Amino acid sequence: MPIILENVSFFYSKNTPLETAALKDVNLRIEKGEFVGILGEKGAGKSTLIKLFNGLLRPESGKVTVDGLSPFSKEVKRKVGMLFQQAADQLFCRTVHEEIAFGPRNFGYSKKETEERVFEALEAVSFDRSMLLRDPFSLSGGEMQRVALAGALALRPDYLVLDEPITGLDPAGKKEILETLKKIKDQGTAVITVTHNLKGFFPLLEKIVLVREGRISFQGSREEYLEAKNVPLPPVTSMMRELKARGLPVNPAIFTVEEALEEILRVKSRLEKEKTEKWSETD
């Protein structure tokens, strides 16, 4: 069963002069196993939206269910793993081992089961066991993010929810996180990420949700998103669309620089071949 939001609204500072409608009549469905990107400008309501998925916030109106359960149930706390933008704000233990084991211990798993989950999560984020005794705060930004991710994975969630997981990381750190998330999704866990980094995430996304001023203005597949008007696109995709509009026979559904280069060279070769054949016919 999926995460379902039905006619959900949420207000900050309700019934005060500072009342702000963060979400308005939101309807959303996220299936197990999907890789979902939640897009939108700052203040659009993205972070508020994902906090409804496991009961961190309570909607003012409407209904939220996770696999048919209330988001405030203990089982949903296990089902929906959360990873916030700043990993350092989520880490507090003295060692990587303690950090990853924290969730299973608090859910009452045995020592043996907890250790199995720690090693499983460690492997999922591509760390070896030598990391377990390291101080989390001695690690790089990308490594800290992976420790926080391992902590969430130790509960074997059905849905992994992330808020800007690669913001502030260097290129190597971004690459590590993106590869890890793809691996997690391929193993059957739904990955739901708030992101501004279309360049990094777009090739991975299966479903896109666009939030504008507290409302969902688009939800659909990546292919449907590319056909939609007035939606933000990765720079390379915008460039390919512009080339197509100017008459070049390129495929505009390109998401990476590597794909764009390959497509441009393919079209260049084709046009040169056609030009040569035309000259041959003239001769």
UniProtKB/Swiss-Prot annotation:
It is a peripheral membrane protein. Keywords: ATP-binding, Cell membrane, Membrane, Nucleotide-binding, Translocase, Transport. It is found in: Cell membrane. GO terms for cellular component: ATP-binding cassette (ABC) transporter complex. It is an enzyme of class 7 (translocase). Pfam families: ABC_tran. ATP binds at residues 40-47. GO terms for molecular function: ATP binding; ATP hydrolysis activity; ATPase-coupled transmembrane transporter activity. Its EC number is 7.-.-.-. InterPro entries: AAA+_ATPase, ABC_transporter-like_ATP-bd, ABC_transporter-like_CS, ABC_transpr_CbiO/EcfA_su, ECF_ABC_transporter_ATP-bd, P-loop_NTPase. Gene3D superfamilies: P-loop containing nucleotide triphosphate hydrolases (3.40.50.300). PANTHER family: ENERGY-COUPLING FACTOR TRANSPORTER ATP-BINDING PROTEIN ECFA1 (PTHR43553:SF24), HEAVY METAL TRANSPORTER (PTHR43553). Residues 3-238 form the ABC transporter domain. Belongs to the ABC transporter superfamily. Probably part of an ABC transporter complex. Responsible for energy coupling to the transport system. This is Putative ABC transporter ATP-binding protein MA_4342. Its main location: membrane.
